[in-house]
Amino acid sequence: KEVGDRLSRLVAAADADGAEGEGSGDADRPTVSIDVDCRNEPTTSVNAVAEVGPDTEEAVYLTAHVDAHDVSDGANDNGAGSALVAEVGRLLAGVEGDLDTRVRLVTFGSEEIGLWGAYHAAETTPKEEIACVVNLDGACSSRNLRVGTNGFDGMRSVFEDVADAFDAPLTTGETISPHGDQWAFVQEGIPAVMASTTSDQSGRGWGHTHADTLDKLDSRDLREMATLVTAAVYRFATGEVAAEHRSRESIRDAIDEGYVEELKTGGRWPYDE
């Protein structure tokens, strides 16, 4: 668990004790001192790009971030996602002649510090050249696929069809989330989803800790996710379904108030008032 989560629970417990008259509240609050010795220096980040399929103007994007949290080995978040991009690309190369739309495989740099790689791609590519985006993040903790659809129903339907075809578990969520590289595209109305996995672990599990190591992963989980994601991307790239773009205004108006506050507080709100 991350230290912040533990501290918040301690503070909440102290507050509860004080409210119930079973403790002093303030007296029970933990006192924390932190001494930080670090430096931030300019550096260069890159996106790695490959393509499969015909040379069409429009492309289906399959993406993941290649960086990890600064204290983490990053096996599941997001080494597994980057490996999946390569594996799905390999599988699609075997049926390249079937594809009607080019598939662009991208591993973004600098996700953990602000989605910089994804923003660069979104800002330097005309919207009409991006059919849709499937972003892989933390997708190897189990064989239970979860897709955050951000309200793009056409993309949700494709993953539901794939899950039915393979008799595979699937959960979906409609909430528009600014967490993950897909957000750089979603905010512009480009259809984009985040594919991950769920497990019995709470929260992000080992993510963002030193314990996010390769020994926690199971190659069978990776194989299952590669199969499902390949089937979905294949459907997008063969024209079986069209993922409809939305206006920036419709995206803006559908964002939950909590995320609106978060984005504005962090200086990341992308819309004019």
Which positions does each model-derived feature cover?
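Soluble metallo-hydrolase cores and metallopeptidase-like ectodomains found primarily
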Residues: 1-75, 90, 94-102
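Hydrophobic residues within well-ordered alpha-helices
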Residues: 19, 85, 185-186
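Conserved beta-strand termini and adjacent loop/short-helix elements that scaffold enzyme active sites
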Residues: 35-37, 108, 173-175
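Structural recognition of the beta-strand scaffold that forms the well-ordered cores
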Residues: 49-51, 60-63, 104-107, 131-136, ...
